[in-house]
Amino acid sequence: MSIPQSNTSLSAVIAVDQFDPSSGGQGVYDTPLGITNPPIDELLDRVSSKYALVIYAAKRARQINDHYNQLGEGILEYVGPLVEPGLQEKPLSIAMREIHADLLEHTEGE
C-alpha cells in the first residue's frame, strides 16, 4: 500500500490525529505563538494607539536584530533580548514579549 504524497503540513496531520468527536466536530490545536501571543489587546493597553505599538515594536526588533548581527564582530552597541528567546524566534516576536512583560521604557514621539 502506498501513501499518496501531500503538501499537508505535519502540524495539520497532528491536529487531525487529535480530533475529538465529543468536542462538537472541533479539532484540538496548540496555543498559537508569535504575533498572537501575547494578545494584541493586552499589548495595546501599554501604548496610546496601534500605530504607536507598531513603531515601538519595530524599533525594538531592529535593536535586537542589530545586536545579533554585531555578536560576531564583538561589538555590543545594542542590548540583546530581555526575555529568553525561543528557538528560531523572530526579533519582532521577542520585542512583543518584552513590551508585554513591561521590560522596556518608551516615550512616544521619539
UniProtKB/Swiss-Prot annotation:
Keyword annotations of the record: DNA-directed RNA polymerase, Nucleotidyltransferase, Transcription, Transferase
Keyword Transcription tagged: yes
GO biological process: DNA-templated transcription
Enzyme Commission number(s) from the entry: 2.7.7.6
Organism superkingdom: Bacteria
Pfam families: RNA_pol_Rpb6
Catalyzed reactions per annotation: RNA(n) + a ribonucleoside 5'-triphosphate = RNA(n+1) + diphosphate
Family of the protein in this entry: Belongs to the RNA polymerase subunit omega family.
PANTHER family from the UniProt entry: DNA-DIRECTED RNA POLYMERASE SUBUNIT OMEGA (PTHR34476:SF1)
Name of the protein in question: DNA-directed RNA polymerase subunit omega
Gene name, Swiss-Prot/TrEMBL: rpoZ
